[in-house]
Amino acid sequence: HLCILKIHSALTILCLLCTIHCAAAPQKAVSDTLLSARFNRYARENPIEKLYLHQDRTNYYAGETIWFKVYQTLSSSATEASRIVYIDLSNSKGEIVKQVKYPLADGAASGSLSIPEHLHAGHYQLRAYTRWMQNFDPEFFFHRELTIYGNSEKDNIPQQTTKFKLRFFPEGGNLINGLTSRIAFEVVDANTGKGVQTEGVILNAHGDSIRKFATSHLGKGSFFFIPQKKEKYIARLAGDNTDFKIPSISEQGFVMTVKHLKEALRILLTQNIGPSTKNSVYSLILHQEGRLIAVLPVDGSQPRTLFDLPLDKLPTGVFTLTLIDEDYHAYCERLVFTHFPETLNLKLSSTISVQEGHRKMSVNIRSTDKKGIPQPGSFSLAVAQTFLEQPTIRDNFSTYLFLSSNLKGQTEQPLSYWNPEDTESLSKIELLLLTQGWRRYSLEVFNQPDNLPRY
C-alpha cells in the first residue's frame, strides 16, 4: 500500500512516498493538524538554547587561565536570546570551585576563567549554561572534561582499581516477550566513565549460554535477541564474575527496529498486543527539536508494519521517531541520524615576522561554501603546545551542535564518529544514539498542566 505523508516545514509542505507492507490499509492517523499545533505551541513556549565553548586547550596546571569563546545558537521558535552566560568549573564531587559570567552579544562572548592555585590534580568539568537553560535538564548544559595537574610532582592524579559497569538499551525502549529486539549495550570503567573493549555472554537461569556479544567501538555494541518472559537472564563479561541484569521484559507491546539502506531509512514496527488493537489509532511521528516533520499512520491490527523513507527527504542531524496513540502516549521511541551537515571550507594562510626578539604570526582566514563562494562568519583560533592538548578527544562545533548536544552527558571521543567519508561513521553514530540517546522531548508534556519557567 502507498500513502502520502505530510512533511511540515517553515518553507513549504513536502510529501514523502513510503511503502507500507501489511495486509490491510492503515487506519486514519492521529490528526496531524492538531499534533502540529501542539508541537508549535510547545516549541514556542520552550525554545531551545545551546552553547558551545571553544577553548585554548583541555589540559592545565593549577593557577593557569582557561581562555574561551562562547557561541550561542537558538531554535527557530525562539523570540529572545539569553544575555548572560554562566561558566562553572567543578571537581569530581560536583562541587563548584570557580564560576564566572559574561554578557552575550550577537550570540557570542569571549572571556577567561582563572584556575585556583590550590586545586589538587584530577579530572574537572567545565560547564556553560544560561538562566533559560536552567529550566530544563542540566544534562543538556554544555559540558567538557578537563585535566588539571597540581604544581607539586607528588600531586599526581590518583589511580583507582578498574571496575566495569554494563548497561543494556533495547532499541525503541522496551523488550517485548517473543519479539526480536536489537539491544545496544555499553561497557565502561566505573571510575572514569570511559568505554572498555571486551566481550560477554547472556545466560539463562540454568547457566546455559543464550547469546554472545562483543563491543565494537569505545565500549559500545549491539546484538539481536528474542526475549522470553518466563526466562530469567543475566549477563557476564569476560574475566569478570559479576552478574549484570538484563532489562525487564514486558508481556505485550511494540518493538521498533531501524535500518539504514542505500537510499532509504527502513523502520520496522512489530507488536503482539493482539485483537484489542483493531480499533486503535497509532501514528509514527518524526520530529526534531520541537518541530513536527511527518506523521505516518500505523494499523494497530497488524503484527508488522514496514516503512521505507527516502533519505533525501529526511533532515540533517539528529531527529526522533516516536510511536504514539490517539491520546499522545508514547509506546516506543529512538533517535536517528541520517545526514551530515554541509560545512564551510576554511583556508588558512600565515606570515611570520620577528619583532624585538619575538616571532609574530599573522593568520588570514578565507571562508567559502562548496561552490567556492565567500561566506561571512564568526571565528576563533586556539594555539596551544601539543603536549597540553588532545584535539581528537573533544567536540568541535559541528559534532557538538549536530550530535552531542542532543545526548545526555559527555560524548567520549566525539570526532571518532564524525567522518562523512567513512562508511562506518553512521554505524558508530547508531550505537551512540542507542546508548546515550535518551529522549529530549517527552510527548507526555502534552497531557500535563502548563508549567511556568522557573528562570
Label every PLM stretch briefly.
Residues 49-77, 165-192, 264-270, 322, ...:
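Beta-strand-rich structural segments
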Residues 40-49, 154-164, 243-249, 335-343:
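Proline/serine/threonine-rich low-complexity linkers at boundaries of modular beta-sandwich domains
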Residues 105-113, 216-222, 292-295, 301-308:
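Aromatic sugar-binding surface patches on proteins
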